[in-house]
Design a protein with these regions (language model features):
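N-terminal pre-domain/capping segments
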Residues: 1-73, 77-98
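Conserved beta-strand positions in the central sheet of alpha/beta enzyme cores
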Residues: 41, 70, 110, 179, ...
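Active-site beta-loop-alpha junctions enriched in small/polar residues
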Residues: 11-15, 43-47, 74-78, 114-116, ...
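Acidic (Asp/Glu)-rich catalytic clusters
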Residues: 2-3, 29-34, 50-70, 96-105, ...
């Protein structure tokens, strides 16, 4: 799996996993392949509990089937906490997640940065930037330099995780890659993603801030999400069309621009089925783009989407830095 390509997969397993007779984590690669998908995000929201030996078994099976794992780190990471001990613990949770990710043959660890709490957004971001720098240093020192940290955009307004905050975090090191959760962004902006142009503005901003490679190979979470005045309230399925955002305009843009993210569906109970729907949307869009005579753009250089904006000063990279789980 040396060649990078667009992938579609799930966060955890759909209700259909057990309905189809699959029983435990060792069955995940077979199930993922059966559903026509080629990515899987192993959920460690409540702690890194999967044994490394079992993870290596899963990795061998996944590699044979062309499936790429990623890992979602524990939810209780708090890179922005006022409590320094919690911030240091967050570094350890990321190290544990990186060890599991490597055992699974994966490349990416996705994580939530934390909340603002009783401090300003600016102060919370400063702490998160420092924690992330410590985490990247710790990964390098522990021999996990190939594992990519992916801070996620968040759905609740009180959480650290606007698009700009995540892009600032990615400025800590050129390897750090954003996890853009479009459902979360739609929820925290109270329905701000209404059109293809809204998606395009987000993609443009990623390219403007991060340049070519990360703008092309970023990480995606997608689901329809109900929201209230505080932002995210509940994940739904693609069948609940009263909740946004719509997936098809995003698939059109990915095809037209030649982008290749890993797309992880987080629908409630139908994530595999809905991921397959997105894959079909994308394949149709890709075919339409080809038949129309349009060609996806060549790889972009940094800043090609527009004028470069100045990154948060604490997010400047060091010049020495490089570029529902089943039981058991």
């Amino acid at each position: 799996m040396s060649e990078w390509k667009i992938r579609f997969g799930t966060a955890g397993t759909s209700d259909s996993f057990t309905a189809m007779g699959y029983k435990n984590s060792l069955d995940i690669p077979a199930y993922t392949e059966k559903m026509g998908l080629d990515a899987f995000e192993y959920q460690c929201g409540h702690g890194v509990r999967l044994g490394l030996d079992k993870a290596r078994q899963m990795a061998d099976d996944a590699a044979a089937r062309g499936i790429l794992f990623s890992v979602h780190a524990p939810y209780y990471i708090s890179a922005s906490s006022l409590d320094e001990e919690k911030r240091l613990n967050s570094v350890n949770y990321l190290l544990q997640s990186a060890a599991l990710c490597r055992a699974l043959g994966g490349r990416r660890v996705i994580f939530h940065s934390g909340s603002c709490g009783r401090q300003s957004r600016e102060a919370a971001l400063e702490k998160a930037l420092d924690t992330l720098k410590r985490a990247q240093d710790a990964l390098d020192e522990a021999g996990f330099a190939e594992i990519t940290l992916c801070p996620e955009t968040m759905g609740k307004i009180g959480q650290l995780g606007t698009l700009e905050e995540v892009l600032a975090l990615c400025g800590v090191d050129r390897r750090i890659t954003p996890c853009i959760d479009f459902g979360h962004l739609n929820a925290r902006t109270l329905g701000g993603i209404r059109s293809k142009a809204d998606y395009a503005a987000i993609l443009d901003r990623i390219g403007e801030a991060l340049g070519d490679e990360r703008a092309r190979q970023f990480h995606v979470h997608f689901s329809r999400i109900e929201y209230s005045k505080g932002g995210e309230k509940r994940h739904w399925t693609f069948a609940e069309t009263q909740f946004g955002p719509e997936p098809q305009p995003l698939m059109e843009l990915l095809a037209e621009r030649g982008l290749a993210p890993v797309i992880i569906c987080e629908s409630a109970g139908t994530q595999a089925e809905d991921a397959k729907t997105m894959k079909r949307f994308f394949e149709v869009c890709l075919c339409t783009t080809s038949q129309s005579g349009l060609r996806p753009p060549a790889p972009l250089v940094g800043g090609a989407f527009g004028i470069k904006r100045k990154l948060h000063p604490a997010a400047k990279a060091s010049p020495t830095r490089g570029g529902g789980i089943p039981k058991g």
